[in-house]
Amino acid sequence: METSEELKQRIGDLSYEVTQHAATESPFTGEYDDFFEKGIYVDIVSGEVLFSSLDKFNSGCGWPAFSKPIENRMVINHDDSSYGMRRVEVKSREAGSHLGHVFSDGPKEAGGLRYCINSAALKFIPYEQMEKEGYAQWLTLFDET
């Protein structure tokens, strides 16, 4: 099993603070905020599949925004009252990584949710690399596009 120090070395200081200590990267600074390539987003810690580029939208909030996870079972939501706010925190199911928060101000036509996710918690797998990286079963997500 990987130690905290090994994990920090593998994913970097910011990703470690975000995923392990629920830190938040500064708005408009994340690698995937203004990024709309075709592919999937996985947990930077565990590699578990989380979001698809098909569900990503520009919310203007300063962080990557998704209307939904690829499958609801892939994330865990729970109430977060830190910093005097009432929010719903989003974590990855397997690794328990802090990803961000979900809000009810997303596109109505896509279900009304906005998953506001830290870039530092994610790793993007380009569509062309999905099979090589071990994510071939998710290629069918893009069959109709």
UniProtKB/Swiss-Prot annotation:
Active site: C116 (nucleophile)
Ranges where the MsrB domain occurs: 4-127
Catalysed transformations (reactions): L-methionyl-[protein] + [thioredoxin]-disulfide + H2O = L-methionyl-(R)-S-oxide-[protein] + [thioredoxin]-dithiol
Any Gene Ontology biological process: protein repair
Intrachain S-S bonds: none
SUPFAM superfamilies: Mss4-like (SSF51316)
UniProt protein name: Peptide methionine sulfoxide reductase MsrB
